[in-house]
Amino acid sequence: MLLYEGKAKKIFSTENDNEFVVYYKDDATAFNGEKKAEISSKGILNNKISTIMFEELAKEGIESHFIKSLSDREMLVKKVKILPLEVIVRNITAGSFCKRYGVEEGIVLDQPIFEMSYKNDEFGDPLLNDDHAIALKLATKEEIDFLRSQTLKINEIMKKFFLKMDLKLVDFKLEFGKDVDGNIILADEISPDTCRLWDVNTNEKLDKDRFRRDLGDLVEGYEEVLARLNK
């Protein structure tokens, strides 16, 4: 039974109350849904890339909702209650960061920047600091401290992993959720929809910016990422 449909995925119940099926759609959206398109095979590519990334992170001790891949478009995941926060890590200046602070794209930051936003389309996912999140009862201080440390750890793992594939991890967003025991674990997806990935040598963008900014065929970019991950 369909439980929820988001911009890029559908969530279905299973016979096990503690497990869901995630179905990856072909829909592409940008600018909080203002730009939309359906792009054939995008969902398949995101499912395959996310599967590889969740498996890679599991090898490094990062627990996520991922259980196993079921098909080209579907994965089985643990039931989690998603926290109403998106966490963002920036290694290189790009996107909204450049617009917000008036800096050039492509500056390598001295250290990663950790950001949080309130996961709410109605308000445009506004940025939050720790005090905002605590005051709005979106998370406790201890939970925010865990999110920060876990996200920065994930950043180091993914940076090294992508670098082996000649990809720069420019920035990315993650979502976390609480499992049935109340533990906070990584959720959602890890794909070129949620990560900015540039070629190390040419800085060619192989992520959703191809769609956002009309920089080339989106599927071609995602296929290139998957091909490198499968090497």
Language model features: what each stretch is:
Residues 107-124, 155-168, 191-196:
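Phosphate-binding core of ATP-grasp and ATP-grasp-like enzymes
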